[in-house]
Amino acid sequence: MMKELIAMFMTLCCSLVLSSCNIPSARRRFFTYPMKEILNDTFSEFIHHLNQHDAQAMLAMFSASAGEEQPLLLDEVDAMIAHFPDPVTITEAASGIGQSSSTTNGENRTKGIGNFSIESNGVRYYVFLSICTEDSANKEEVGIIELSIISVDNYHDSTLFGGDPERKKGINILE
């Protein structure tokens, strides 16, 4: 009985300490914006722009460094619009969520990854999304870093997760 009371007291104390946390980034990360919601919102917005064939809005969602590493990012966005002339629907929300947060020399960085399933014109696709939500040392890194897509028929584990040499920052249509 005493152990249970101590455990309840410790849980209450930890909850109070965390809820009174004065560090906005800690509060944001742990209480307001779970990575799954951020990934789902980002991907939903991207698919909305894709369905509207709004290349500029899609391009604006990528980190500036993705554009620097892939100077033809606008061409990749146009290729994606051409690849999906019909409406795209999200058939599976973010799964396989990963998040990394780090602080180096007082600089904070938070990245997230997730997998989605979409469908267009009767064809199903898997999508890998990598985003940066915070980088106080390099603001240009914030945004979509990589979006890789492959049809379910052509999928194998090494394509999206095995470091395919064809993948790069930006958009990768792996067909």
How does the language model describe each region?
Residues 21-52:
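Short, low-complexity N-terminal intrinsically disordered segments enriched in polar/charged residues
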